Amino acid sequence: MTHNHSNEEGSIGTSLHGVTAREQVFSFSVDASSQTVQSDDPTAKFALPVDSEHRAKVFNPLSFAKPHMRAFHLGWLSFFTCFISTFAAAPLVPIIRDNLDLTKTDIGNAGVASVSGAIFSRLAMGAVCDLLGARYGTAFSLMLTAPTVFSMSFVGGPSGYLGVRFMIGFCLATFVSCQYWTSVMFNGKIIGLVNGCAGGWGDMGGGVTQLLMPMVFHVIKLAGATPFMAWRIAFFVPGFLQVVMGILVLSLGQDLPDGNLSTLQKSGQVSKDKFSKVFWFAVKNYRTWILFVLYGSSMGIELTINNVISGYFYDRFNLKLQTAGIVAASFGMANFIARPFGGYASDVAARVFGMRGRLWTLWIFQTVGALFCIWLGRASSLPIAILAMMLFSIGTQAACGALFGVAPFVSRRSLGLISGLTGAGGNFGSGLTQLLFFSSARFSTAEGLSLMGVMAVLCTLPVAFIHFPQWGSMFLRPSTDGERSQEEYYYGSEWTENEKQQGLHEGSIKFAENSRSERGRKVALANIPTPENGTPSHV
């Protein structure tokens, strides 16, 4: 008899149904003890499949299931709301400058101020996440900065305008809590995509506000308010959104997959760390500072663009206020796809090439985006300028997504503070580029854009120096030292021998075990031992 083994009939392992873990197995038991074991399974309480740290191995953006997907949605929506507030003034600058008699220098300094405050708040947020949890950090940032958003309605001059924009910018610290929250909720194999979606959809608030604020301004004006009164009333909208999100985060959020940080610390399930130790291991790791520079030349540029792009199209191409807002909004709206794409590309590259693939992906996206930034500044017609802006936005935002496919692996113990330092790099880069290129009459806005692109190309080069002994770098292979080439050694080195004896490092060891996928498929397959019969053990 001839047997026809087709793909439709089965695949390798079908003769051992239920053994290979590739098939669905149907079974039931009437034994009470077996039912008890199933109900006691610690992973049974999760809606998504999880790893040994109870971090989700699947990403389902259409779900709001607790705790993983709920934390994801609360994180990005909080950041989205804060982005709207921070850049709410930018599309209304043509009206505000006439009302407050602002000069180009005043507007430029206010733009610098709007992102400079977050340099400090993001550093603080990193420590808050490590020590208190992402839920409190996010909610405090939203609620404490909401009054400053309302205060914009009562500004009377240039100094008040600058001061209020500086204080509103503190809320951008929610980016750090957002990325930290998703990093502790999702497995490393999908962290690039998840962080890309969370950060990208949050960044999209910079585009939405370019549409929202002119629309709200127009509606209020139609209701009978004067232009100089309408822009002031409009700021009650983003302030109200922050209050609502703060309440939702406190009432619905959860710090970690197994519960809130304070509760787990009291029960002894999670150790309570010291700020001095967390801070030390973050600042002494040179990779942290390279990420600081890299994010300053990707996210920093994006923040700068949010402040200048609407006015650039309004003045250079004589567009109407609402039209300029629509064009400018397209830059920020690209985050919906571009940043998640960058994170997903990082994950895909890691599956084959490991961490080295993530680093190459980051360098390619960031360099290409910077080159299109140069082109944007040299564009002489509206269609070419819009095309250059869109290509620039895709490259730069994809680079941001790819960068946070790397950042979660720099440290386990100081994850929050490293996220904070990296995020602060974005604000520092934005403040620096606005100060250098857009705060005086030395350069036109077009010249400033091109020079900013050149600066970004140069600042992307240090990615080549990021080297992990267990995974290698862009040009160098992993360490040949047997002990140092292990993930457990890298993450365990952040703990002293005394701390290890107390078992405080166990979370880092679990993280190390789940990070072996960063070796890449080729390395992983090469390391699988071959038994005497010559058949690889993974087949």
UniProtKB/Swiss-Prot annotation:
Q: Name one Pfam family in it.
A: MFS_1
Induction section of the entry = Not induced by nitrate.
Record InterPro entries:
MFS, MFS_trans_sf, NO3_transporter
A GO cellular component annotated for this chain's UniProt record is: membrane
The signal peptide, as residue positions, is none
Compositionally biased tracts (Polar residues): 530-539
| Source domain of life | Eukaryota
Membrane topology per the entry is: Multi-pass membrane protein
* Protein name in UniProt: High affinity nitrate transporter 2.3
- Native source species: Arabidopsis thaliana (Mouse-ear cress)
